[in-house]
Amino acid sequence: MTWHARLQLDYRREGPRTVAGFLHDGPLRILQSLYPEGGGICHNVLVHPPGGLVGGDTLDIAATVAPGAHGLVTTPGATRFYRSTGAPALQRTQATLAAGARLEWLPLEALCYSACQAENRLTLSLSPGAECIAWDVTALGLPHSGQPFATGRFTQHIEVPGIWLERGTIDAADGLLMDGRLGLAGHRCLASVFFVAGEALPRERREAALDAARAVIDAHALRETAGATSPHPQVVVVRVLAPVVEPAMELLRRAWGAWREHLWGLQPRQPRIWAM
């Protein structure tokens, strides 16, 4: 049996408070809204009770953020793509931000088991004045548990329509990609965190984002396999390769915190579930 689950998450501003509403079809839920930073920023945890996707499963997640609203979304665990005997598994996430909206999209990693056939797609559409911090983390197999990513294909798609597109397929059988010096060089976690604006960032703000990210990288143990770039005047990206998820995620959280502080004047208040 396969699933096609859908979730519509909507953030809106009610006075000084950001309020979340949602509709769902199938096994996708949003847990109770939390306000550890006060009413202006609404924290939510997205849960998928089955715990993973098999061939033929589809998860469709749509999020909208209304003017002046600020939402933060994370997950309690990895999105697991299990082995497939035919049809691919697909997760599609579409976030749409109105003018003056902010969104922090911070799920835990996508975990690709050997023999999976899967695609993970993220699309961010921002109106002028909207801003978003999001990340994407992919783990290939469970190397410390003796479960390598030996076979299978995983496609990763990240898009800001008309602004920025990254799409690539990781084939476990491609030795040059998996282990070559110009590929993953034996690393089994690839991750990126990106700051996206709905209009071109002023030069000073863009440079501040790059400087803050590079300071984090220079102080981190993964500095040899990480870097910060700005592929478009509306986008700043930090990328990193790591042997496993944990050090890469630590670097991304530090970069997220630095951008929060330098670009939004907010302290890096981590979601409570990250401490569990």
UniProtKB/Swiss-Prot annotation:
It comes from the Bacteria. GO terms for cellular component: cytoplasm. Keywords: Chaperone, Cytoplasm, Nickel insertion. GO terms for molecular function: nickel cation binding. It holds the Pfam family UreD. It is found in: Cytoplasm. The keyword Chloroplast does not apply. InterPro entries: UreD (IPR002669). The keyword Hydrolase does not apply. Required for maturation of urease via the functional incorporation of the urease nickel metallocenter. Belongs to the UreD family. UreD, UreF and UreG form a complex that acts as a GTP-hydrolysis-dependent molecular chaperone, activating the urease apoprotein by helping to assemble the nickel containing metallocenter of UreC. The UreE protein probably delivers the nickel. This is Urease accessory protein UreD. The lineage of its organism: Bacteria, Pseudomonadati, Pseudomonadota, Betaproteobacteria, Burkholderiales. The gene is ureD.
